[in-house]
Regions:
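Extracellular glycan-interacting surfaces
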Residues: 1-325
Length: 325
């Protein structure tokens, strides 16, 4: 079974789900984001506050700097459609790419040329904004979606040469965007302004929220075996979504066009936990959740959960969750 990596504000934890073993591995700078490599066993990518991008080839045990030092890295992903293609987002909002596993980097077309850019602003730091999330098309390496926090979800069909601005009715404050391999035109979004979904690659959007009793969504994942099963984490607002001790996070599950149902089997009622980070696993029904208590697993598409590992100390903030190949 694959190792699971959890990035906190100070370290990257490597968790063995077979026995719950947790090993912490420090980087030269504070982690900000995390991604597993879909092609190379044991390879992971981590962005940091000012130290740039780091790569691990031994399941998080050691990390090597691979570029973009001095930039504030806020998001990172490895393309599932092209080996060694890595996408990175920064604050202020820029997108960088490497086609050789971090040996060389180049910036895509500048995002601030988009008409909506004067309206972009991150509320805690209103004079700036950043790339919160990068989502790649499962089979088209040139197509991806970029979440600007806050103000826009933009896209490209040509690898960032031309960016397409946000569309009416779409999410404003996207935190995460999930795509299933078998439904590449279906986008599922967890946003600060609610839940959004599109079945035409983001041209049009809808917001089915029947059953959601809170409106601030942090994370989203799709059952690997069923593209119609979506889970999200949510809370009443940003502080209670992220900060242990004042948290009221919860997890919801939805099948097809049905209503949202809150996960209760193995998941505590609020106010017991932050809104967890979520990730799809490697087999049908397998989903993962990380909160301030530890790592949790579902084998039935999010209906029930069980704790796999508990951290040795409570982290203040979680920065990333990745299931290694």
């Amino acid at each position: 079974m694959s190792l699971i990596l959890v990035a906190t504000e100070s370290t990257v934890l490597a968790i063995d789900p077979r026995d719950g073993t947790v090993a912490g591995h420090d980087l030269p700078d504070r982690p900000t984001c995390l991604a597993a490599d879909p092609f190379v066993d044991g390879r992971a990518w981590c962005g940091t506050r000012r130290g740039g991008v780091f790569r691990s080839d031994d399941a998080g045990a050691s990390w090597q700097a691979v570029g973009l030092a001095g930039r504030d890295i806020t998001s990172i992903t490895a393309s599932p459609a092209q080996r060694d293609l890595i996408w990175v987002g920064t604050e202020p909002s820029e997108v960088w790419m490497s086609e050789n596993a971090g040996d060389d980097w180049r910036q895509t077309a500048r995002l601030e040329t988009l008409p909506s850019s004067p309206e972009w602003s991150f509320p805690p730091k209103p004079d700036t904004h950043h790339v919160r999330w990068i989502a790649c098309h499962p089979s088209d390496a040139q197509q991806l979606w970029i979440a600007i926090e806050a103000g826009a979800l933009v896209s490209t069909r040509d690898g960032g040469r031309i960016w397409r601005d946000r569309v009416d009715g779409g999410p404003w404050d996207t935190h995460e965007l999930a795509i299933h391999t078998n439904a590449p035109a279906s986008l599922r979004v967890a946003a600060g302004d609610g839940y959004f979904e599109s079945d035409d690659s983001g041209a049009t959007w809808r917001s089915p929220e029947d059953g959601l009793d809170v409106g601030y969504l942090r994370s989203v994942a799709i059952d690997p075996g069923r593209p119609d099963v979506v889970i999200v984490s949510a809370s009443t607002g940003p502080r209670s979504a992220y900060v242990a001790g004042v948290s009221d996070g919860r997890v919801y599950r939805r099948e097809g066009t049905g209503r949202w149902e809150r996960a209760r089997d193995g998941w505590p009622d609020p106010p017991r936990t932050i809104a967890p980070l979520l990730s799809a696993g490697r087999v049908a029904g397998e989903l993962w959740a990380a909160d301030e208590r530890g790592l949790h697993r579902s084998d039935d598409g999010g209906r029930s959960w069980r704790e796999i590992a508990r951290y040795t100390k409570t982290p203040n903030h979680l920065r990333g969750l990745s299931v290694l190949r």
